[in-house]
């Protein structure tokens, strides 16, 4: 992917991109797997696309910021071909035929993260994200969700796969109360709500379809104790996701979690 960036206004940049990619998803469509009889299914996408991104940031840290704001707006257009191959080792009448589909779509997204100092020790952050994609469904439900937009506002959510927080159109909001224990220590809470406009559901044949508008709500929360260093940070956290049930996680991170940009942002 080739990108060209130019200054935009006083503290933003405009980025223009164009590229071609071949992406491959490997997966199973059921939780009951006999590895001696079944291999993974595979969906392959050959895609050409372009993008325009307007982005700016005055945050005081790459991660666990307490001051400033960040804003990003992106518009992207793609066209490409999807190929599907079943992993079934034995061919039966129920084995899917080789699949090929051409589709084009537009997607736009917006993110805003802002921090407001309420008192010398207390800061309140706010987060807003909106996403829209006109992309059609893939060959099956699992493939569709793997290519859908994902709501991942925290570092932990970026490295986990959670079907409940994926959709082709959604809105998400969040609040981040932060108490500054000292110059380097902070106690940080992050609480988010996620609403897919049309939730993607699975029918009895393993195909995707849209449910009724605004009939689903998910949430996630995380509390962390953060020690900021000049070269990174140390964070001990506990978090909870509304789906799947009883999804609690505890962990410790060292340094920064940095993620490369994706072909489809």
List PLM regions with ranges.
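Flexible, solvent-exposed loop segments that connect beta-strands
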Residues: 30-40, 87-97, 153-158, 203-211
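C-terminal outer-membrane beta-barrel translocator/porin domains of Gram-negative envelope proteins
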Residues: 49-182, 186-192, 197
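Gram-negative/organellar outer-membrane beta-barrel architecture
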Residues: 1-64, 69, 146-155, 163-171, ...
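Short, mixed-charge, low-aromatic patches
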Residues: 6-13, 126-134, 147, 207-211
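C-terminal hydrophobic structural anchor segments
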Residues: 178-222
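Internal helix-turn-beta structural module
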Residues: 222-224, 228-232
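Intrinsic-disorder/low-complexity loop/linker signature
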Residues: 120, 205-206, 231
């Amino acid at each position: 992917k080739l990108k060209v960036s130019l200054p935009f206004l006083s503290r933003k940049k405009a980025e223009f991109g164009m590229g071609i990619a071949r992406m491959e998803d490997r997966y199973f469509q059921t939780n009951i797997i006999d590895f001696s009889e079944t291999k993974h299914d595979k969906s392959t996408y050959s895609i050409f696309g372009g993008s325009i991104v307007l982005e700016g940031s005055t945050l005081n840290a790459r991660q666990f910021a307490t001051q400033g704001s960040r804003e990003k707006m992106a518009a992207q257009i793609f066209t490409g071909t999807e190929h599907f191959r079943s992993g079934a080792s034995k061919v039966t009448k129920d084995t899917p035929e080789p699949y090929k589909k051409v589709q084009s779509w537009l997607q736009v997204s917006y993110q805003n993260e802002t921090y407001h100092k309420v008192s010398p020790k207390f800061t309140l952050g706010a987060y807003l994200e909106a996403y829209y994609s006109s992309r059609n469904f893939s060959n099956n439900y699992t493939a569709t969700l793997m290519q859908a937009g994902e709501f991942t506002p925290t570092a932990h959510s970026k490295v986990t796969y959670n079907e409940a927080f994926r959709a082709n159109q959604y809105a998400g909001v969040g609040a981040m109360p932060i108490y500054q224990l000292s110059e380097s220590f902070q106690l940080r809470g992050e609480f988010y709500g996620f609403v897919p406009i049309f939730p993607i559901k699975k029918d009895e044949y393993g195909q995707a379809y849209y449910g009724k508008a605004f009939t689903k709500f998910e949430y996630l929360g995380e509390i962390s104790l953060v020690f900021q260093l000049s070269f990174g940070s140390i964070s001990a956290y506990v978090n909870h996701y509304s789906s799947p049930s009883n999804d609690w996680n505890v962990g410790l991170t060292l340094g920064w979690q940095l993620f490369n940009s994706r072909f489809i942002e």
